Amino acid sequence: MTETAGSLGLPLDMPPHVYIVIAVTILCVRVLHVALAPPPRRPMDGPPLRTMVVLGSGGHTAEMFALLRAMSPRRYAPRHYVIADTDTTSRVKAEHHEAAVGESLAESSDVDDDELSIASEYSVGTIPRAREVGQGWIHSFFTTVRAAVHAAAVVFRERPHVLLCNGPGTCVPVVAWAFVARTLRPVTWFVGVGSRPAIVYVESAARTKTMSLTGRILYTTRLADEVFVQWEGLARRYPRAKFAGRVC
């Protein structure tokens, strides 16, 4: 009579490759479940949501801060900004934005000291660029791996409830690891690093006819829960994308 493995009823003498096939099948089902499931929904009157914001440069940064100014700092707090390690401009802009947020909250009569402390909290972290302009493809492989390792550390350390990005290539490894964090949540929850971030991507207003490479990657792979575009024509071309007006 064949001996079985616990309550699963699997024979203990099965070849190792069978267990591998079973494990891979379970993982694939889990990935599909996460990719096709609706984004996490949280009540609007719930506790503050840890928010991670990936900043690019130039127009991307300007659009992101326009978007952040429309969001409640009391609801989306604390905020952790992720920038490329060679991007000093975005760090300065983040600090200026947060200084303005702090002043506005301090002047508000309905914000107590505890709420002010939480809503004003922010931090800035860096990750290496996955690829510099003009960099060769072979060298890019190693820099991409390095960026992915740093992105994983950021995501599992900060455990965001919301991940917000709008186009820079820097966001791809961060989004990928946020998706991994959701996929592995049944496991990571037990060791205290689990999170279930809602991943939101906002395409740049500069993209009027087609999505950027980053946008196409996140849209096609379904790594992003919500994809917003700023032109109605783009929403018609990409049916799962949503048009909600322009940021600025």
Please describe what each predicted stretch is.
Residues 1-248:
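Nucleotide-activated sugar donor-binding and catalytic core shared by glycosyltransferases
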